A protein has these predicted regions:
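Outer-membrane beta-barrel proteins
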Residues: 2-333
């Protein structure tokens, strides 16, 4: 699972940078200045972290221990974004966790866009989809929150996102793989209301690949209650196949966080999922698990956290209830 805490740090910096550009300027919309160094800004983060679970009894990581560098380009209404990860992946037992130990590189995002008065229209060789921005709005924990099984990072992403008053919206089309013969083609979008006290979003995604069709409906949001934040994600993932071997997954995730001090925040969440198989004679499967997390901010550049996930009911008597741990520390620049 890649909630990509490191990328969230970078994304926050890039969002802030884009937000500082006023589209209501006197320059004509399609008039651009010659390329200059002042049109570029760089942000990033250095991370150290990883996972452990009682099933594999291995220590492993394929994203958190990395240097992420993002370059932002702005020229009037023209936008550009490039994010590269320089990773140091590892696994103490590659037979159980198939992660090759050693350095790796990844272009996490690469897109060009145009800022209109109603939102940002972009084309990304690799980018997040629209729904990925909001499907986990109800997760207030650190890493092991649960949400709809929609597409996150995708390829050839055409996306439009914007906000009008309190209403937020987004839509995208994408492919799930850089190999078009192997990729699924998908479409998703969301509509939401954003207020100072609460945020709520409804989303939809559809993907098709040959004889398989998948539809996802999600509802997510959060609300501030005093100093605490409460969140909830609800979803239905419906997979239909021509051989009637599909399934419908109905799930929810409830979470809450509370700042014990200005630096320390504690959080917890509960996840429940019911899977209804289309295969004749196959019983429904009910799964549940709980996670607790702590997040500590040392200063405006250094933060860290730990998240512990415990299976409550795997829904399968042959599977043990396992424990999963994630811990990481990040320095942003």
């Amino acid at each position: 699972m890649k909630k990509t805490l490191l990328a969230l740090v970078v994304a926050a910096a890039s969002t802030s940078a884009f937000a500082n550009v006023d589209t209501q300027n006197s320059k004509p919309e399609f008039e651009f200045d010659p390329m200059h160094k002042d049109q570029f800004s760089v942000s990033g983060a250095i991370g150290l972290g990883g996972y452990y679970d009682t099933a594999s009894k291995a220590l492993y990581d394929d994203w958190a221990t990395a240097v992420t560098v993002a370059t932002i380009y702005q020229n009037n209404r023209l936008r550009g974004y490039l994010e590269i990860d320089l990773e140091m992946n590892y696994s103490t037992d590659e037979s159980k966790k198939a992660i090759q130990s050693g350095p790796a590189t990844d272009v996490d995002k690469a897109w060009l866009g145009y800022e209109t008065d109603f939102g940002l229209l972009s084309f990304g060789w690799e980018n997040d989809t629209a729904l990925d921005k909001v499907d986990g709005a109800g997760d207030t924990t650190y890493e092991f929150g649960s949400s709809a099984g929609d597409t996150s990072d995708a390829f050839n992403v055409i996306k439009f996102e914007g906000k009008a008053s309190a209403f937020a919206y987004g839509i995208s089309t994408f492919e799930t793989d850089d190999d078009r013969e192997a990729a699924e083609t998908g479409y998703n979008g969301y509509f939401g209301v954003e207020q100072e006290v609460f945020n709520i979003y409804a989303g939809y995604e559809t993907r098709e690949n040959g004889n398989e069709d998948e539809e996802i409906v999600s509802l997510s949001g959060n609300v501030k209650v005093g100093a605490a934040t409460l969140g909830a994600n609800f979803w239905v993932n419906d997979l239909e196949t021509s051989t009637n071997t599909g399934k419908t997954e109905t799930g929810y995730y409830l979470s809450g966080s509370y700042p014990v001090t200005e630096q320390l925040t504690l959080a917890a969440g509960y996840n429940g999922v019911t899977t209804d198989s289309q295969v004749a004679g196959t019983a429904d499967v009910d799964m549940s698990r709980v996670n607790i997390a702590a997040m500590y901010t040392l200063n405006d550049r250094v933060d860290m956290g730990i998240d512990i996930l415990q299976d409550v009911d795997t829904g399968d008597s042959a599977k043990d209830e396992e424990t999963y741990v994630f811990a990481a520390m990040f320095y942003s620049f």
